[in-house]
Swiss-Prot record:
UniProt family annotation: Belongs to the class I-like SAM-binding methyltransferase superfamily. TRM61 family.
Protein name: tRNA (adenine(58)-N(1))-methyltransferase catalytic subunit TRM61
Function: Catalytic subunit of tRNA (adenine-N(1)-)-methyltransferase, which catalyzes the formation of N(1)-methyladenine at position 58 (m1A58) in initiator methionyl-tRNA.
Disulfide bonds: none
């Protein structure tokens, strides 16, 4: 379901009902008796035929769009069991951990399964995702959800990794990427040595809301031999592109002059009317009623109006000139968590590089060879001295 796309909606499929940008509801299709009720009306499942289609309600009061599920859209519509990892963070984490088709990934803290769907797609059918959850109820719900969504490369495990580690009986994990979403990740870091692939570079990311957690995790990573430690905080803003009507200075000046002229004309007419009413003795109520009718009639004419003020104009109308502009959100999305990254060098790499990722001196990398070379050099230096004697 999440690893491949299709056009036709079948019985038992998952459909995301898109109502608004902030209202997306998951629907498990039941063709015979299913009915999706919203404030826009009722939508029978039997009418759900194609992904991407627009479906009208039975009462003709509104419509929804039938969207194919993706990890990004599932993040916006899933039932929350815990705090989740949103796409802003998950996309960056996948890139930093270098998760790709065929990767073996460890995830500790399954929670609502938001990030699990993202890394399952990135690892592909050739990869494996070992997901650990210590809370039994959340583990059972997540396991059922993964089975319904056909995430066949996800292996969920019920375990407290902080105390019991990551080992799985009869399985050699050999992970190259690790994601820890735990209250105390520093207690789980020492257990990683047994389950990461030491023949290549392994990478870890700790997802921690509090800075104190980051400090303790950094200490644990350093003690366990991890290098290239870096903390990142992702702050995202949404940019919206649209068309805006062009307004020249000459048009603005002409518009202001026209408004001023019409104001002066209106004031002159009003003064003349008051003078006539005073001379003729017309009653005030009749005068007010006549003024209301006249203002209503004259309001339809706005004089010089180059930008269609007061009119309903469709964006991009060829009667006006437009330019493309981008507008940023006023507020940055609030802080979610700190992302702590680190790398574990392969065994060969540890012989070449130190903890600061600097190349070790040759004498440290090959102590035996360097000792033999030093002895040979000493003998070569002493030999001519004996000859001269």
């Amino acid at each position: 379901m999440f690893s491949a796309y299709k056009d036709t909606i079948e019985d038992g499929d998952l459909v995301l009902g898109w109502m608004t940008r902030t209202a997306i509801k998951p629907i498990v299709v039941e063709k015979k008796e299913g009915l999706f009720n919203t404030r826009y009306g009722a939508f029978p499942h039997r009418n759900m035929d194609k992904y991407g289609a627009q479906l009208g309600s039975m009462s003709k009061q509104g419509f929804i769009h039938l969207i194919h599920p993706t990890p990004e859209l599932w993040t916006l519509s899933l039932p929350h069991r815990t705090q989740i990892v949103y796409t802003t963070d998950s996309s960056y984490i996948v890139q930093r951990l270098k998760i790709r088709p065929g990767s073996t990934v460890i995830e500790s803290g399954t929670g609502s399964g938001s990030f699990t769907h993202a890394i399952s797609r990135s690892a592909g059918l050739a990869g494996k995702v070992y997901s650990y959850e210590f809370h039994e109820e959340r583990y059972n719900l997540a396991k059922q959800e993964f089975e319904r969504h056909q995430l066949t490369n996800v292996i969920p495990t019920h375990r407290d990794v902080c105390n019991d580690g990551f080992d799985i009986e009869n399985i050699d994990v050999n992970a190259t990427a690790v994601f820890l979403d735990l209250p105390a990740p520093w207690t789980a870091i020492p257990h990683l040595e047994r389950v990461i692939d030491r023949s290549v570079v392994s990478r870890v990311c700790c997802f921690s809301p509090c800075f104190e957690q980051v400090v303790k995790a950094v200490q644990a990573l350093q003690e366990a031999g991890w290098v290239d430690i870096e903390m990142v905080e992702v702050a995202a803003k949404r940019w919206e592109s649209r068309l805006e009507m062009k307004r020249s200075l000459d048009e603005a000046i002409t518009r202001l002059r026209d408004v001023k002229a019409r104001r002066e004309t209106g004031l002159a007419k009003r003064n003349a009317r008051i003078k006539v009413e005073t001379e003729t003795g017309v009653e005030e109520e009749e005068s007010d009623e006549r003024d209301a009718k006249r203002s209503k009639t004259e309001s339809g004419h706005r004089g010089y109006n180059p930008w269609g003020k007061g009119q309903k104009i469709k964006e991009g109308d060829e009667s006006f000139e437009w330019t493309e502009v981008s507008k940023c959100e006023q507020e940055i999305k609030s802080h979610t968590s700190y992302l702590l990254f680190a790398s574990r060098l392969p065994k060969l790499g540890e012989e070449v590089f130190d903890k600061d990722m600097c190349v070790r001196p040759y004498s440290e990398r090959c102590p035996e060879t360097s000792t033999e070379g030093a002895e040979a050099s000493t003998e070569a230096t002493e030999a001519p001295a004996r000859t001269e004697a």
